[in-house]
Amino acid sequence: MSIKDQIFLASQHLAPHHLVSRGMGLLADSRIPALKNAMISRFVQRYNVDMSEALVEDPLAYPCFNDFFTRALKPDARPLDDDSANVLSPADGTISQLGPIREGRIFQAKGHSFGLTALLGGDAERAAPFEGGDFATIYLSPRDYHRVHMPVTGTLREMVHVPGRLFSVNPLTANTVPDLFARNERVVCIFDTAYGPMAVILVGAMIVASVETVWAGLVTPHKREVRSTRYGPQEPIVLERGAEMGRFKLGSTAIVLFGPGRIRWFDTPSVRGPIRMGETLALPANHLEDVPAV
């Protein structure tokens, strides 16, 4: 490991994660033209952001940096896989890992894994349907489209905010920080689907200002404790396949979980390979009529 990497990792453990993130959040929400234009211009240049797909192509037309970062795309920019039975990638990014959930552990990187129950907020009953199932971890780089969409149609059952640290998420931290995704702050969304239970976890990272969902808006609890909100059949929240479910403001990673025997990977997507929202991530393990809805 280089000296530079060692210094970076030391800073990750010593930095006041939430204080840094709150400060960056204030800057990212600033509507002072000179400040927000300088931030956006520098970001576009540094990360070579492709604005041709954006609904509003002029990066300086956005009122603040966060609006630019969570920009909408043109309606035809991300066509969905034609076969409605196939499971879609929820986001643009890189498949950092995918595979089976074994003995309650999810693979993070060589020599590292993290606990399924810990990832989902420490509730063994919540985790049980996914034991022996499958997971995919998708990392969203700074230049990527940062809205997260539904892999399949689902009815929201529960949303859980899990407080935690805000380590940066990148190959270096994935290979060196134990239990990275089960330590970082995250929002867990559990859906009932034709494939059984599905979880979509939005994992925060250093300088992540916030996470939003389309049903709850900003997820910003004041107490440092796990908070669960359950949704009943009286006013069901149903999100269609490909519909937006949430977005990152300066953030980070989406993890998708399915129960055992529900899906199989589409042509074994390449770990470290790029994927776009709407592309096929997985196929149903059986015909959908043979997979009872929960």
UniProtKB/Swiss-Prot annotation:
State where it is primarily located.
membrane
Q: Which GO terms describe its molecular function?
A: phosphatidylserine decarboxylase activity
List the catalytic activities from the record: a 1,2-diacyl-sn-glycero-3-phospho-L-serine + H(+) = a 1,2-diacyl-sn-glycero-3-phosphoethanolamine + CO2
Enzyme class name: lyase
InterPro entries in UniProt = PS_Dcarbxylase, PSD-B, PSD_type1_pro
**Which cellular component appears as one GO term in the record?**
plasma membrane
What stretches pass through the bilayer?
A: none
Modification after translation, per record: Is synthesized initially as an inactive proenzyme. Formation of the active enzyme involves a self-maturation process in which the active site pyruvoyl group is generated from an internal serine residue via an autocatalytic post-translational modification. Two non-identical subunits are generated from the proenzyme in this reaction, and the pyruvate is formed at the N-terminus of the alpha chain, which is derived from the carboxyl end of the proenzyme.
Q: Does the keyword Lipid biosynthesis apply?
A: yes
Q: Which cofactor does it need?
A: pyruvate
Q: Where is the active site?
A: D92, H149, S252
Functional pathway? Phospholipid metabolism; phosphatidylethanolamine biosynthesis; phosphatidylethanolamine from CDP-diacylglycerol: step 2/2
Cellular location(s): Cell membrane
Q: Name one Pfam family in it.
A: PS_Dcarbxylase
Alphabetized, the UniProt keywords read: Cell membrane, Decarboxylase, Lipid biosynthesis, Lipid metabolism, Lyase, Membrane, Phospholipid biosynthesis, Phospholipid metabolism, Pyruvate, Zymogen
* Topology class, membrane: Peripheral membrane protein
Q: Where is this site: Cleavage (non-hydrolytic)?
A: G251, S252
Free-text comment on the cofactor: Binds 1 pyruvoyl group covalently per subunit.
**EC number(s) on file:** 4.1.1.65
Query: Which residue positions does Pyruvic acid (Ser) occur at?
Result: S252
Q: Name one GO biological process term.
A: phosphatidylethanolamine biosynthetic process
Q: Which family does it belong to?
A: Belongs to the phosphatidylserine decarboxylase family. PSD-B subfamily. Prokaryotic type I sub-subfamily.
Q: Which NCBIfam families match?
A: PS_decarb
Under the subunit heading, UniProt states: Heterodimer of a large membrane-associated beta subunit and a small pyruvoyl-containing alpha subunit.
Q: What does this protein do?
A: Catalyzes the formation of phosphatidylethanolamine (PtdEtn) from phosphatidylserine (PtdSer).
Q: Would you tell me the protein name for this molecule? A: Phosphatidylserine decarboxylase proenzyme
Annotated source species: Bordetella avium (strain 197N)
